């Protein structure tokens, strides 16, 4: 998993403060905007935060990408397994963490699997991944279309996507997906996004008490 900045609105916070003062044109050029943005966050004036945008590149798995793509206020561009060979992103499919199913919460897992059980299944999973990649490449080598061959690949197959959204969308996404109830791997992505958000929107981050 990795997350990195691709682009952000120049002077993003200054831009949001400028449009927030649309009804006070004599004060629009005021360079002091920390209190203004803090006030807007505190009192849920979220439309202001729809005026600046950020695009991040996210390296993850097909399984987690499906969760991310459910956030429909963003726009996306994802690596196409129909157009390109999946091995362009990775020659092998990386191992993932194994956790026990929480019997009281179907959307939660607990990290207390017996090490010997974990080792047993990791061996089987690695074999399964290797066989899947061999089968996939064999299908491509035999002239079978990528759009057909991709269906034999596991959800753990690496993917890359670009995620673009307003400051408001990023605040909502990070707040939701860094909280309890989110799958650990998705939470790790949200935390990485949060780190970049704090760097690019420091005034907002402070008002949100993220720093």
Protein language model regions, located:
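Family-specific signature for flavin-dependent thymidylate synthase
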Residues: 1-211
């Amino acid at each position: 998993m990795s997350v990195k900045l691709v682009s952000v609105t120049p002077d993003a916070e200054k831009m949001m403060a400028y449009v927030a003062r649309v009804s006070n044109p004599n004060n629009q050029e005021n360079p002091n905007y920390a209190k203004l943005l803090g006030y807007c966050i505190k009192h849920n004036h979220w439309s202001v935060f729809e005026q600046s945008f950020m695009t991040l590149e996210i390296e993850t798995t097909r399984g987690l990408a499906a969760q991310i793509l459910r956030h429909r206020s963003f726009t996306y561009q994802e690596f196409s397994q129909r157009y390109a060979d999946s091995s362009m992103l990775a020659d092998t499919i990386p191992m993932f963490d194994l956790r026990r199913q929480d019997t009281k919460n179907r959307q939660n897992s607990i990290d207390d699997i017996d090490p010997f059980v974990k080792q047993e299944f990791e061996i089987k999973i690695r074999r399964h991944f290797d066989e899947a990649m061999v089968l996939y490449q064999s299908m491509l080598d035999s002239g079978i279309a990528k759009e057909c061959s991709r269906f034999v690949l596991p959800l753990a197959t690496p993917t890359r996507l670009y995620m673009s959204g307003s400051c408001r969308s990023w605040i909502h996404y990070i707040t939701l997906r860094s909280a309890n109830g989110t799958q650990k791997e998705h939470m790790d992505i949200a935390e990485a996004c949060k780190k970049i958000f704090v760097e690019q929107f420091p005034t907002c981050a402070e008002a949100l008490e993220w720093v």
